[in-house]
Amino acid sequence: MAEPRRVAFISLSPVRRREAEYPGPEREPEYPREPPRLEPQPYREPARAEPPAPREPAPRSDAQPPSREKPLPQREVSRAEPPMSLQREPPRPEPPPPFPPLPLQPPPPRESASRAEQPPRPPRETVRLELVLKDPTDESCVEFSYPELLLCGEQRKKLIHTEDPFNDEHQERQEVEMLAKKFEMKYGGKPRKHRKDRLQDLIDIGFGYDETDPFIDNSEAYDELVPASLTTKYGGFYINTGTLQFRQASDTEEDDITDNQKHKPPKVPKIKEDDIEMKKRKRKEEGEKEKKPRKKVPKQLGVVALNSHKSEKKKKRYKDSLSLAAMIRKFQKEKDALKKESNPKVPVTLSTPSLNKPPCAAAALGNDVPDLNLSSGDPDLPIFVSTNEHELFQEAENALEMLDDFDFDRLLDAASDGSPLSESGGENGTTTQPTYTSQVMPKVVPTLPEGLPVLLEKRIEDLRVAAKLFDEEGRKKFFTQDMNNILLDIELQLQELGPVIRSGVYSHLEAFVPCNKETLVKRLKKLHLNVQDDRLREPLQKLKLAVSNVMPEQLFKYQEDCQARSQAKCAKLQTDEEREKNGSEEDDDEKPGKRVIGPRKKFHWDDTIRTLLCNLVEIKLGCYELEPNKSQSAEDYLKSFMETEVKPLWPKGWMQARMLFKESRSVHNHLTSAPAKKKVIPAPKPKVKEVMVKTLPLHSFPTMLKECSPKKDQKTPTSLVASVSGPPTSSSTAAIAAASSSSAPAQETICLDDSLDEDLSFHSPSLDLVSEALAVINNGNKGPPVGSRISMPTTKPRPGLREEKLASIMSKLPLATPKKLDSTQTTHSSSLIAGHTGPVPKKPQDLAHTGISSGLIAGSSIQNPKVSLEPLPARLLQQGLQRSSQIHTSSSSQTHVSSSSQAQIAASSHALGTSEAQDASSLTQVTKVHQHSAVQQNYVSPLQATISKSQTNPVVKLSNNPQLSCSSSLIKTSDKPLMYRLPLSTPSPGNGSQGSHPLVSRTVPSTTTSSNYLAKAMVSQISTQGFKSPFSMAASPKLAASPKPATSPKPLPSPKPSASPKPSLSAKPSVSTKLISKSNPTPKPTVSPSSSSPNALVAQGSHSSTNSPVHKQPSGMNISRQSPTLNLLPSSRTSGLPPTKNLQAPSKLTNSSSTGTVGKNSLSGIAMNVPASRGSNLNSSGANRTSLSGGTGSGTQGATKPLSTPHRPSTASGSSVVTASVQSTAGASLLANASPLTLMTSPLSVTNQNVTPFGMLGGLVPVTMPFQFPLEIFGFGTDTAGVTTTSGSTSAAFHHSLTQNLLKGLQPGGAQHAATLSHSPLPAHLQQAFHDGGQSKGDTKLPRKSQ
């Protein structure tokens, strides 16, 4: 180990010589090692024999006792003589004898030793050193110095070869001395004096400090590099102690220089005072410059001026620092003193005396002279290598004088940016002023960008001139008012130019101002803002005056109010105290409350103040526009301005920033209106009632329905208005319930507006209409509820009969209320369910829609829950239509009602042909109305009316086909009411309905969520379970066929936005017929009436669609669809029921489909955003479920029945669940309101495989949706789940009751069932009304008379 170390330590040419003399490769290493020490301690190796002993002492010195492992050459051992030379210096003397020429070369000494005794000992060349290596610790580790080891060994050998090394005091002392010298050499001492002035000896007094230490603040400039000859006044490095005081570092000069420095700074100020301060600074800087110049030279040599980047900071410091300013003089004096010392030392430090002198001069002139490696050829050296120091200092003085005239600050700024200009400038500065300036100017001043405006260039020239004059006059304050004006003028012109040009101009200006570019830009921006603030000053003052003029009066009034209040309060307190002894505590409690309640400091604006405020804001906005980087939005910018600047103009507490913002909105609205628009967006929904019905999503539908509901109420003069006029959506449940009871008697007179969508949007259905619709739904015509939503505006006030029926239905249907809550969709759902129909239509509109849905669902749902669930082929649709016809003719009063409704619908459809939109709406409304009167008169709405009308033809067939028909109608009305209407009338019940149904199903998805859902469900049920829910129950084939027939009018629907829904409209008449046929099928006698209802619902939906040509839009379409959908939903529920009750495979299927459709439609109404197909299904599901429980069965019974159906109910159940969840949206809300919601769900599950359980589409009975509507979206429970849920709780009772009610309602006359919750048939008057509505589609608002 020692060997490697000696190699490291030893590197002396003398050693090599010695090696040459004595072959000893090892020694070579030794020498190299020794050289460092050899200079100080050239010793011989004679001690080798005893190396171990010396080693031990050495270890002490080194902190570890070394034993020599390597054999020392015998020569070394023989060099016992040198041992005396343990002391490094003494050895030097000895070495001379051996090698006088090379006293520093240990090899010669060794040779001398060898020459005496060991010339014969060449083996000596191999040195053995035994070194004891100790484990290193945190404090120390073993270090060996080969030369020292050799010395120690030799000395020991000579002096104490046999003695115990530890007992050798002499050697220990020598070792200690050696150590001291070693450290002296390494860390300081006199040798340093020689080097202290060399450029490379400039030391960084901050070196070694942790730059990242948060405690150390480097923000202020300090002289990082100072000559080694200088140290701080008290030694060390100070942080944040102000200007550093320097003193000579050498021990001898320390005290003198410290004194000098202490006294000199004051002297300098006395001498030069004001002027001197600048000169001092410049002189100091000049010193720096000279240092830098020298650094510059080094730069050329590869050394960079380390301090150049600190120049700016130093500049600042120098301005205030007298001691630093005097530093150069101190250096001069120091140099004089050093001169004498340095001359002898020159040879040691530098190879040539000339070189040595320059370094000293450099140190004297500047703190930062960086490099000692200046070769005599250095260009700048001659400056300092004058023959004598005096000349050198003289030159430095001249340079200082020159620098005094030079703008050092500017130079420093440039230096701070790292521009070589400062360095080279400084360098030249020391040499000659002209050179310096000539170099600085070109480098410092970047050229101006091309193509600047003439005015701008002129102003820049003005700035140049001003800066030049300023420099000549002496630096006092650069940024005078004139200078600021020039800069501001430049800045204002630069604002119009691009950022690149601006940056170029700033870089150019930087050369003329005493700050760097960043500071300049900040100053310009501040000037600009100050000017803007000046512009604000006057308007602010005016506003303040105006406020101060108005405030006294307002303050006086306020004080009067406060006095009056306090008097009243005191009086009250007294009375209270008299009354109660404990009044004091209560009074204390009251006092704060009264203070809060007390008179408000409300400022009353007048036009003058408002105008002044607006003017102020306008100016401030101009300032905002000028800001290059707008970190804040205009709104935040203005608010902060008002908070900080404007608000304080009022007495405290009299003004809020938000009021200022509000009052000045007219001025800043164009910038701050975006958020406002967002906030206002919700408000428009109610306004766009018609359009919204078409476009709004289901969730928005309730609101629309609510809004529309008042209109309907206005239209409906009968008691229905009273009962239904409750809160729009949520109150619709209660309203429907009330209306439901009153609706039964009023079944005969149901007035629905023909154009469900449009009119409903503008005219909310009256309570009468809603009640009638509910009654109709209760009677088993459950088609309207879904459509009723859309048709609500169109529905005209329904007669009292509907209200009575609705009231009765409501009382009977427990589920009605929850459905009503859903709002329009909810009401539809309730109506569909029949029992639920009543409660659903809290809003007249909602009631009407709900009623329609209920009516449709009641009949349809009972008959074929299954059918509703699965898509129905065209053939099935046709069969369903046929069955509907049969049912229509054969079914009891309800069937009759359905028939009449269907007939009306047919008529309506034809009328629609003429004026399809209106006719479709009216038809749908009529159908719905009929259904409502039968099932849920309260729900009768424009949609109901349409449904009623459409039902007129296919009332009986409603179970399957009618539902489809309704869906078609709805869809078509929504998209293109007229066109669809016509196709509906045109297609034969079987044929048209079939064809159009698929389209309808598709259309529904196209339409808005609620409408879409309705339409989709209808279409899907029309094809599988679209609107057929009600009729679907009647005949399973019919459900398939009927919905498909509805699709037949597809061509017509295709014109509409939703292709599928559109066909449904056109197929409406067909569907009605089909529905009738479907209803007729024996499997579903009840279904017949139900079919009729669905047919009506279809009509209503169609009407709705017609009314909202934008049926595709979630809102409008949804509404119209929802009514039909709701009808379907009850149908779905019933469909589940009928399969259980009159289980007929085809019938069941049909019913199921029907129910599915209704549920979907209902849900659709609920969740308008849902795709049309799913949406309509959802809608129908919601309506269906509600209707089923309430409408089909009496109250709870209806709900229970759908539950009963396990197969379809599974679908229904899913729907029901979905409906429940969706009820809050629209159709779902209906379902949720109705306790039998689950029941509806089961029909949904049962009815439609397609209908995947959607949480939202619970009530939405998935119809066999020809259009693949993603029911999953709504989260219908699985079909099975739906069944389970329904049957689990109220499924058995509800399903049974619902089925019974639906069947009964459908079979008996609509009036009968109106009285009974689930009367499947629409009241005669309802049917008539629907029919009339269908005929006068244009007059959607005309009340319909019951035929």
Curated annotation (Swiss-Prot):
The modification Phosphoserine is found at S13, S250, S311, S416, S419, S422, S584, S1123. Residues 16-37, 67-79, 122-134, 574-584 have a biased composition (Basic and acidic residues). Keywords: Acetylation, Isopeptide bond, Phosphoprotein, Ubl conjugation. Residues 1-134, 250-301, 573-597, 707-740, 815-849, 880-913, 981-1006, 1035-1218 are annotated as: Disordered. This is Ubinuclein-2. The modification N6-acetyllysine is found at K1068, K1148. It comes from the Eukaryota. Expressed in several cell lines tested, including primary and transformed cell lines. Signal peptide: none annotated. Belongs to the ubinuclein family. The modification Phosphothreonine is found at T243, T252. GO terms for biological process: chromatin organization. There is a cross-link at K272 (Glycyl lysine isopeptide (Lys-Gly) (interchain with G-Cter in SUMO2)). Residues 721-740, 880-911, 1035-1045, 1061-1070, 1077-1095 have a biased composition (Low complexity). GO terms for cellular component: extracellular space; nucleoplasm; nucleus. Residues 93-110, 1046-1060 have a biased composition (Pro residues).
